[in-house]
Amino acid sequence: MFDRFVGIDWSGAKGPRQAGIQLSMAVPGRGVPTRIDPPSGHLWGRQAVFEWLVRAADAGNDTGDAGTDTGDAGTDTGDAGTDTGDAGTDTGTGTDTGGDGNGNGSNESARGSILVGIDFAFAHPFCDENAYYPGLAGTPETPAALWQCIADICKNDGHFYGGAMFAAPGFGDYYLSPRNHGAPHYRSRRRVAELAAKASARAPSPTFKAIGADNVATGSMAGMRMIHALKAELGDAVAVWPLQPVSPARPVSPARPVSPARPPAMVLVEIFPSYYFHAAGLNPARNAAADPGFMTAALNAWGSDGVGADYAPRGSDVDEADAMISAAALRHIAATPGCWQAPQAAAMEGWIFGVPV
């Protein structure tokens, strides 16, 4: 069904580029996921990720050519919390794995579908209060409406930044942020997926928390803006699971000689890298994933070969390791029966790929 599996460790931090954004790609088999370098040769930014995804969704294009990072229009005026893990300078050289997963770019004219996992919440909690923003007049009532709302409020913020949400009249009172430490409507609400993740391994922080080291809201606001833009750009060529159902392809057989319809060119799923480490029985705290032995054990748990002795992940919080484990987990989970099933709540709140229903 998929011939590429891309894990993206995300960042909602302010600015055109973030050291915390890292991309890693796996291909079918057991090969260790390999890094995708930014087009600038320096750091990824959210606009560059958006442009890469648009190109990757075109099965006839060589995704090893990420193009030019041109930035996006608008003035970055929001003021959110601090998205940690984005400090430092990324100066190393790496591999653009648009090709065979071994660092060789491909010029094939035909490509299969690509499964992309990104580390942010695709929606806010809904089912606990039957609303994203309980008590707020005009609160969005679907995930697509939520993305549209965030995009409209943040339209003057460049680089898909989402900080304007935290100061928006009405909406800002739901977010715990540096602007609003006493947010009157903030609650530690959890999505059904987060409750399930906690029960089986580990859960992320509340999606309305925009402050501190476990800030989730800043990245999620930026991410929902990007999803909105991807749907506007690509339409049905991209499916956002589980908000849009994905049916696994079945092999052609003599009893069924006609191949089923191809899946969309790209399927986006929500990931939580820490969950994949903890589900493997490993704790990545204090940069443990920088150790080759630790990372090899984690990758092996997801059916992947391990890293070499020269393994040195990028990012101040070894963010590249998060992208790598996610790519390996995507490849493994996508081959698991029932992986595309999700509870009814997921249609409004999203679901973390691989968390048991």
Question: Whereabouts are the PLM-identified features?
Answer:
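A detector of long low-complexity, disordered segments enriched in serine/threonine/proline
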Residues: T95-S106
